[in-house]
Amino acid sequence: MGQEQDIPWILSTGHISTQKGENGQQTPKLEHHNSTRLMGHCQKTMNRVVMPKQIVYWKQWLSLRNPTLVFLKTHALKRWRLFSKHEWTS
């Protein structure tokens, strides 16, 4: 699973198409740019806090159509609290 954390979220979604750049080269084009950027921000924040890999459930993130920053923060906090509570009791 260590290698999976190094893979950017945009590559794991399969929502990548291409667009031609100014020089005619094909470049990746994100289908859901805002949600991808928000997820990247949350992923970096969670990594800084050294949250265990169990906290991040990729399928949940991928199932979100238009996540808002408030929702993502709330969701991450709930997951962190549940994990912390579990760690203290075990």
UniProtKB/Swiss-Prot annotation:
Record field: compositional bias (Polar residues): 14-28
Subcellular location: Host mitochondrion inner membrane; Host nucleus; Host cytoplasm, Host cytosol
Cross-referenced InterPro entries: Flu_proapoptotic_PB1-F2
Keyword entries, A-Z: Apoptosis, Host cytoplasm, Host membrane, Host mitochondrion, Host mitochondrion inner membrane, Host nucleus, Host-virus interaction, Inhibition of host innate immune response by virus, Inhibition of host MAVS by virus, Inhibition of host RLR pathway by virus, Membrane, Modulation of host cell apoptosis by virus, Viral immunoevasion
Region annotation (Disordered) ranges: 1-30
UniProt superkingdom: Viruses
One GO cellular component, as annotated: host cell cytosol
Region (Mitochondrial targeting sequence), start-end ranges: 65-87
Marked site (Low pathogenicity) residue numbers: N66
Signal peptide location: none
GO biological process: symbiont-mediated perturbation of host apoptosis; symbiont-mediated suppression of host cytoplasmic pattern recognition receptor signaling pathway via inhibition of MAVS activity
Additional information: Is not encoded in all strains, and seems to be dispensable for replication.
HAMAP family found in the cross-reference section: INFV_PB1F2
Stated family: Belongs to the influenza viruses PB1-F2 family.
Subunit: Oligomer. Interacts with human SLC25A6/ANT3 and VDAC1. Interacts with host MAVS.
Function: Plays an important role in promoting lung pathology in both primary viral infection and secondary bacterial infection. Promotes alteration of mitochondrial morphology, dissipation of mitochondrial membrane potential, and cell death. Alternatively, inhibits the production of interferon in the infected cell at the level of host mitochondrial antiviral signaling MAVS. Its level of expression differs greatly depending on which cell type is infected, in a manner that is independent of the levels of expression of other viral proteins. Monocytic cells are more affected than epithelial cells.
Protein's name in the database: Protein PB1-F2
